[in-house]
Amino acid sequence: VRKRWLLFSLLGGLAVLALTLSGHTPGHTPGGADRPLRPPPAGLYGWDWQIGATDETQVGMPSGIRLIDLDAFGTSAATVARLKAAGLYTVCYINAGSYEPYRPDAARYPARLKLGVDPNWTDEAFVDVRDVFRPRSVLAEVLKDRLRLCRDKGFEAVEPDNLQNDENVPGGVITLQDQVDFSGWLADAAHALGLAIFQKNGPDKVLLRDRTGRRLADKFDGILNESCQRYDECAPLAEYVRRGKPALNVEYDQKFLDCAGARRLGVNSMFKDKYLVGRREAAYRRVACEPRP
């Protein structure tokens, strides 16, 4: 499930134009060498998720947070720098497993990649994640360029959405192993650019091995989950905690927020408004579990 708005399309287009004018082209790494990876903070702490902010002027910093997650296309390098200067760890949202028609790179997705309509977002389509392993893969190049966009804006980590196409695409076209292999590929691609990366949802997959033989909980640098308390699936998130990595969770119905239970597992859980808007917007809601009771 993703929560973000169409107005990011215009902002994203301007960002792509700016990168082009500054000499960035798809497939090019500015400066040649990539930076060292900085992992996200471990342990219990406050964080926020504002990927649905109408625009970046609506983004704000709640007191006491250490990490913030924002949209790749809708957030400027200047905003990222400001947040980092304030001491925040910055995470970059991209949609890895779906086609979104309003993104500035949407024209790069051929029809053959689109396997099924997302019932929650009917203008979108789940993509064929197997494509990244094919020669001259279109999807691999699109996603690598999105990762470069995150890196070039100064983000330290990435949140890739829709890593459950084995469940989302009808007819069993994408197998469980196909999906796990794709997730592992994303982790490797992010790390190659000096970006940390969160597993998005799929707590049942944390101990599965990709084609390199490594478990997802060993490859990813943390996990960001939605509604694990509502669906009683938080326990697997503790695999990340045991590895010294952060586990983040959001509930969209406050009655399911169980702070004592989250703390026992080492999970950073909070209640958020459904559309994850910016802190300065009227619809913004956030009730976070305190790191200590």
Tell where the protein language model's regions lie, with residue ranges:
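N-terminal Sec-pathway targeting helices
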Residues: V1-L10
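C-terminal region of N-terminal signal peptides and the immediate post-cleavage residues
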Residues: L17-R35
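Glycan-processing catalytic domains of CAZymes
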Residues: P30-P293
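Core hydrophobic alpha-helical transmembrane segments of single-pass membrane proteins
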Residues: S9-L17
